[in-house]
Amino acid sequence: MLLLGRLPRPAWVPGSRAQRCSSLAALEGPARTRSYWRYLRRLVCGAPQPPYAHVCQVGDPVLRVVAAPVEPEQLAGPELQRLVGRMVQVMRRRGCVGLSAPQLGVPLQVLALEFPDKLLRAFSPRLRELRQMEPFPLRVLVNPSLRVLDSRLVTFPEGCESVAGFLACVPRFQAVQISGLDPKGEPVVWSASGWTARIIQHEMDHLQGCLFIDKMDSGTFTNLHWMEVND
C-alpha cells in the first residue's frame, strides 16, 4: 500500500511573507481539531487505511498521482478483490455512476462503473434524450486504455465525488472504446457513446491524476448550494 507523506514546505526566505504565513499553510487553512470521541476512535483503532470507505477530496495528493498498473500476479488476488468490493460498495452508497481506485486512496488503474435504472429515472425524459443517457450494468476494468471513436466534442455539466458540491460544463468526445481486464484477468472491450462515453472519460482522467476542473469551462463552475446560502 502506498503511503503518501505531507507535501514539503516551501523554502523560508528571511524578510519574505513566508515568515508570516507560508504558502503551504495558506493552502492547508486553519488547524482542524478532532472531537474527543473521534480522537478516542483513532487512538484505539488507528488511522483509516486505503481503500477508504469515503471518497478522497480535491487537495489530497493521491488524486494528482498517475495511477500504476495492476501487476499480473495481483489479478484475482485477495487485495484486488477487496479493493473492487470496496469501490462498488462506496459507489452504490454514494449513488454515483463511476469511481476510480485513486478516489479511495489507492493509486492503481482500476475503475468501477454502473448506471442503473433507478439513477437514470432521476433525470427527466427530455434530459435523458438530450444527453443520450442509457443505463448499463456494473463493469469493473483493470489497467484500462481508451481509444476515441468519434472526436466530436459534446459539452454538458458534470460533477465529481472528489469535488463534492460543485459542477461545471466539460467537453467530452462523443464516442470512445475502453479496453482492459476484468478482476479475474479476462479481456474486456467496451464501445460507448453519449453519456456513457462521458462517464468513461471522466473516470479514465482520474487514472492520470486529472480532475474535471482541469478541463471545465471555468465560467460555468457552480456551487450546487449557492441558493441555500442566499436564503
Swiss-Prot record:
Reactions catalysed, as given in the entry: N-terminal N-formyl-L-methionyl-[peptide] + H2O = N-terminal L-methionyl-[peptide] + formate
Any one GO BP annotation for this protein: positive regulation of cell population proliferation
Active site: residue positions: 203
Ligand binding (Co(2+)): 160, 202, 206
Superkingdom of source: Eukaryota
Cysteines paired by S-S bonds: none
GO CC field: mitochondrion
Alphabetized UniProt keyword annotations: Cobalt, Hydrolase, Metal-binding, Mitochondrion, Protein biosynthesis, Transit peptide
Keyword Hydrolase attached: yes
Region feature Hydrophobic dimerization interface, mapped onto this chain: 153-163
Localization of this protein: Mitochondrion
A Pfam family it matches: Pep_deformylase
Cofactor(s) required, per the database record: Co(2+)
EC number: 3.5.1.88
Cofactor binding mode and count: Binds 1 Co(2+) ion.
One annotated GO molecular function: metal ion binding
Transit sequence range: 1-26
Binding site residues for substrate: 59, 157, 159
Family, per entry: Belongs to the polypeptide deformylase family.
Its biological purpose: Removes the formyl group from the N-terminal Met of newly synthesized proteins.
Subunit structure, as described in the record: Homodimer.
Protein name according to UniProt: Peptide deformylase, mitochondrial
Record organism: Mus musculus (Mouse)
Source lineage: Eukaryota, Metazoa, Chordata, Craniata, Vertebrata
